[in-house]
């Protein structure tokens, strides 16, 4: 399903709420030149980090690379393009895509290297950067519990990027920690099943 040159959002914050089993399956296939959209590139020995180490990623759009020295090495060697985006801005760009918006305005990054190549707008005397929405071909997300209709429950911090990414991709695959044959209680649902295309168990 996932092919070369696809753009892929991957939920999680370091190792919390990451669809690690799906990423292991991707590593078993000969898929490369992926554009990764995630909070971070994890660590070299885990999930997103293994994709970097195995040179499956051509571009990473992330907020943080400090826990994976291989990301920095490949970036400095010109082997990997890295677009560093402030974390709040990254989330808002994804949210904007999911909501069908044309972008977001943020004061974060004005007057810094983040501003380079971006449109600066002044509103009521304050400068803002215009940030384009981020959408992907695939979103790989995690679910603490998923029912057979694709409704997802996320516990605690596992919500992180998973909730917003589910709205901003053409195809959404959720990795279920627990699969429920019974429908989830509506009060439990974090991500409605309408956003989910496939369930991986």
What are these regions (language model features)?
Residues 1-201:
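Conserved alpha/beta enzyme-core scaffold
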């Amino acid at each position: 399903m996932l092919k070369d040159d696809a753009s892929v959002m991957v939920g999680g914050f370091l190792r919390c709420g990451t669809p690690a089993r799906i990423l292991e399956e991707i590593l078993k296939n000969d898929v490369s030149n992926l554009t990764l959209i995630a909070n971070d590139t994890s660590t070299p020995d885990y999930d997103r980090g293994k994709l970097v180490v195995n040179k499956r990623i051509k571009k990473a759009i992330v907020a943080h690379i400090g826990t994976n020295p291989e990301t920095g090495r490949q970036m400095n060697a010109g082997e990997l393009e890295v677009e560093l985006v402030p974390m709040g801005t990254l989330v808002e760009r994804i949210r904007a895509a999911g909501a069908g918006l044309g972008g977001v305005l943020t004061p974060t990054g004005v007057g810094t290297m983040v501003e380079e190549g971006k449109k600066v707008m002044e509103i009521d005397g304050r400068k803002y950067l215009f940030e384009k929405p981020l959408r992907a071909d695939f979103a790989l997300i995690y679910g603490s519990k998923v029912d057979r209709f694709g409704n997802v429950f996320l516990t605690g911090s596992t919500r992180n990027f998973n909730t917003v990414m589910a709205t901003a991709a053409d195809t959404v695959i959720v990795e279920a920690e627990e699969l429920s044959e019974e429908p989830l209680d509506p009060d439990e649902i974090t991500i409605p099943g309408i956003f989910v295309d496939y369930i991986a168990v």
